Design a protein with these regions (language model features):
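The feature captures the helix immediately C-terminal to the Walker
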Residues: 6-7
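Post-Walker A helix-loop "phosphate-sensing" segment adjacent to the P-loop in P-loop NTPases
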Residues: 10-20
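ATP-dependent small-molecule kinase phosphotransfer cores
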Residues: 21-82, 89
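Switch/connector loops and helix/strand junctions flanking conserved nucleotide-binding motifs
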Residues: 28-29, 92-94, 112-117, 157-161
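Conserved catalytic network of the ASCE P-loop NTPase/AAA+ motor domain
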Residues: 30, 74-77, 95-99, 141-143
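Conserved phosphate-donor/acceptor-positioning beta-strand/loop module used by diverse small-molecule
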Residues: 82-87, 96-120
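NTP-dependent small-molecule kinase module
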Residues: 100, 116, 120-124, 138-174
Length: 174
């Protein structure tokens, strides 16, 4: 899925940076502060929101998630491209504040293919799978608000397409 595409791009291009999200949920086994997430208390998170410290934020399943603004701006200032691997609600918040950002929607080849990928992970219950599929179908309704879409039916092609989009954006005249 999206995460695999992002990992491939990061591995192949040292000038691309992945933003690290903040969350109020507890760390899972193997997750590292500042690498997997920035882990915060509810109070810290709400304070940061009030101070304009996030590009986007949302409450999901009783926990807050968001993209801290300062690290992203620092990477952009250093001349790097920054990837935000976020849901459509987050993307729409970012687009409102930064309409010149480049928004790429990664589409599954089909709902059946998406179901199969989620099931293949073996980490989610049937109920969770149904919730994820419903969310994915709702997210597809936002496709028209994105600049590009890439169908992830072949991983190498999808990675190549995203790289080409990123390159084309650098070559734009206006």
């Amino acid at each position: 899925g999206k995460g695999t595409i992002v990992k491939r791009i990061l591995k192949s291009d040292g000038k691309v940076h992945l933003s690290v999200s903040a969350t109020t949920r507890n760390p899972r086994e193997g997750e590292e502060e500042g690498v997997s997430y920035y882990f915060m208390s509810d109070e810290q998170f709400v304070k940061a929101v009030g101070e304009g410290g996030f590009l986007e934020h949302a409450s999901v399943h009783g926990h807050y998630y968001g993209t801290p603004k300062a690290p992203v701006m620092s990477q952009l200032k250093a001349g790097r491209d920054v990837i935000l691997e976020i849901d459509v609600q987050g993307a729409m918040q970012v687009k409102e504040s930064y309409p010149d950002g480049v928004f790429i929607f990664i589409l599954p080849p089909s709902v059946d293919a998406l179901r199969s990928r989620i099931m293949h992970r073996g980490t989610e219950s049937e109920e969770d799978i149904q919730v994820r599929l419903g969310a994915a179908q709702r997210e597809m309704e936002y496709l028209e608000h994105y600049d590009y879409y890439v169908v992830n039916d072949d991983l190498e092609k999808a990675v190549d397409s995203v790289k080409k989009i990123m390159a084309a954006e650098h070559w734009k005249v206006t």
